[in-house]
């Protein structure tokens, strides 16, 4: 698996939207307490759990999930969550919240001595689970998007890209043990050099 240097993604700093991503607006966001954006948090999600390509994540982030579609949906029907981006297993990228807004992805969290990571982070959901490998195209998209985000928000560095499990230990497990951090970082570095 190799990352190619054909980055189709760039951030429009006038709108804080990702060029190259499909735009679907979530109502689940608010203003950041400051303009600082200095952390990138990697998550995983699948709805129903363990199932892919259902578009239920989109419905969930837009408060349009029908609880009668699956028993698990009844459990989460009142949650209001979002992420800035979703990278599906096919490589499709969807943006739900502009980067200058506070998406609701991290919950109770801390990083580098600071609480409330939603205040200063960008959240990226990978369609997947803790127990299945992610796809090559997901790693490619994640590396390309991370590169674009670091160029646009220079306080995000490679050392400030982390997993949800790292900022909410004991509460969250994603992106999970099968997320290959070494592969991501090595290919991210080749993307930067290439």
Question: Model-flagged regions — what are they?
Answer:
Residues 44-45, 126, 165:
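Residues immediately flanking
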Residues 42, 124, 142:
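Conserved, mostly hydrophobic/aromatic
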Residues 2-15, 115-120, 129-194:
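Basic/polar, cationic surfaces and motifs that engage anionic cell-wall
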């Amino acid at each position: 698996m190799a990352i190619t240097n054909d980055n189709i993604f760039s951030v429009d700093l006038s709108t804080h939207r990702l060029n190259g991503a499909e735009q679907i607006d979530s109502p689940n966001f608010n203003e950041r307490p400051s303009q600082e954006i200095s952390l990138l948090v990697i998550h995983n999600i699948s709805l129903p759990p363990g199932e892919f390509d259902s578009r239920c994540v989109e419905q969930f982030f837009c408060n349009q999930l029908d609880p009668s579609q699956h028993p698990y949906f009844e459990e989460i029907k009142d949650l209001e969550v979002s992420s800035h981006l979703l990278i599906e297993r096919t490589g499709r990228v969807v943006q739900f919240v502009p980067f200058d807004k506070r998406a609701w992805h991290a919950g109770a969290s801390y990083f580098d001595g600071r609480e409330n990571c939603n205040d200063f982070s960008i959240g990226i959901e990978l369609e997947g689970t803790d127990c299945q490998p992610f796809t090559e195209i997901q790693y490619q998209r994640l590396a390309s998007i991370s590169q674009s985000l670091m160029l646009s928000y220079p306080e995000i560095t490679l050392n400030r890209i982390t997993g949800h499990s790292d900022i909410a230990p004991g509460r969250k497990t994603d992106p999970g043990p099968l997320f290959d951090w070494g592969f991501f970082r090595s290919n991210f570095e080749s993307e930067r050099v290439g």
